[in-house]
């Protein structure tokens, strides 16, 4: 039992450290590099269910190991509506508090035209025939050889999503003052918690 507790505490500490690294990096820039997603794929990343985003093109190396704002585009496509009702999307969306309006089929209450989270982009790896990915993660993307898996680390989900106009490819997002304040407050809180634990 002790070893399990120690392992859990170690994992939580690593998660906190990674989140602090993400938030600190965001505060060091005037803008944040952003990527637009179609939902529900973007929301799945924001809630931590989806760890990789598959694209036909790689993220340039200069953006690796840095923050990436997750923007949701303005429409819920027919394919997306269908996907929302299928496993594992349906389960992870419900678990995160999203629900469909049963009076109107497929009317999912998902964020649109908004930046909803900021993630740490680890790298973009070219997918090969022997690329390893678990079953659930594979169901979240298109892992055909030759495509690229954008791998995410820590993710900070904004308390209040921010309206924004997305673009193709990577683009620069200038957060509102309220976003900077929220991130600074979260970082200060994590630091305070760390100081308390270190003296416990």
Question: Which sequence ranges carry the predicted segments?
Answer:
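Structured alpha/beta reader/binder surfaces that contact nucleic acids or chromatin modification marks
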Residues: 4-9, 13-200
């Amino acid at each position: 039992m002790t070893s399990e507790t120690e392992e859990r505490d170690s994992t939580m500490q690593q998660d906190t450290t990674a989140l602090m690294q993400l938030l600190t990096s965001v505060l060091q820039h005037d803008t944040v590099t952003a990527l637009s997603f179609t939902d529900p794929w973007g929301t799945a990343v924001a809630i931590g269910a989806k760890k990789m985003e598959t694209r036909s093109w790689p993220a340039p190396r200069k953006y690796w190991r840095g923050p990436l704002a997750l923007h949701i585009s303005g429409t819920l496509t027919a394919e997306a509506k269908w996907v929302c009702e299928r496993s594992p999307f349906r389960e992870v969306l419900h678990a995160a508090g999203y629900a469909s309006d049963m009076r109107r089929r497929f009317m999912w209450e998902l964020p649109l035209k908004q930046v909803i989270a900021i993630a740490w982009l680890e790298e973009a790896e070219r997918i090969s025939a022997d690329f390893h990915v678990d079953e659930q993660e594979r169901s979240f993307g298109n892992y055909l050889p030759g495509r690229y898996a954008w791998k995410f680390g820590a993710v900070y989900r904004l308390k209040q999503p921010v309206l924004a106009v997305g673009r193709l490819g990577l683009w620069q997002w200038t957060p509102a003052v309220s976003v900077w304040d929220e991130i600074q407050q979260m970082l200060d809180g994590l630091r305070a918690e760390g100081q308390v634990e270190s003296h416990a």
